[in-house]
């Protein structure tokens, strides 16, 4: 895990800066210090949890086992409840979307973890590859040295999808409780694989999304 100091930062992106309805308006948020996983939870990590607890394996795994060569790839096709159960087992929790965004961009309002301009080859997105990659395979780290916070796999957060203060959400959202997912995947374009783009995915039920994984956070002991 890597340490993220507490700070006030400007969350979201205004329309004049290219923000869409999900991202705007930009607003001030304060987060307390925390630790965040340097990498997304891998198939290898998740398999230990499945073996120890008897929790169901992702439906994409054959006979409860991940495919050959996938040990260091992010675990995907997990529901929000699956991700939450893993986090609890690991003595951690899922990040709020405020924590996730701050860990991805820091205090200077950057659009990508490395700066404001897209740079090909720093993240697994925008046509870089046609498949998910091992964690840490790309060097586009955040100000706090976390890897893969844009591209590769979407990431669950603890937060419900809600409009930002003074904003609104598009009217075509699926029904049910939606949890915020962040970061985009290897199939995302550079417009969506950003530190600010957000969307929601149903939290409950057996439906999974094969490009969504997660990472965990841990509170700093006081």
Which positions does each model-derived feature cover?
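Short, surface-exposed beta-strand/loop micro-motifs that present aromatic residues
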Residues: 27-28, 37, 143-145, 205
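Short, compositionally biased
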Residues: 1-56, 80-81, 211-222
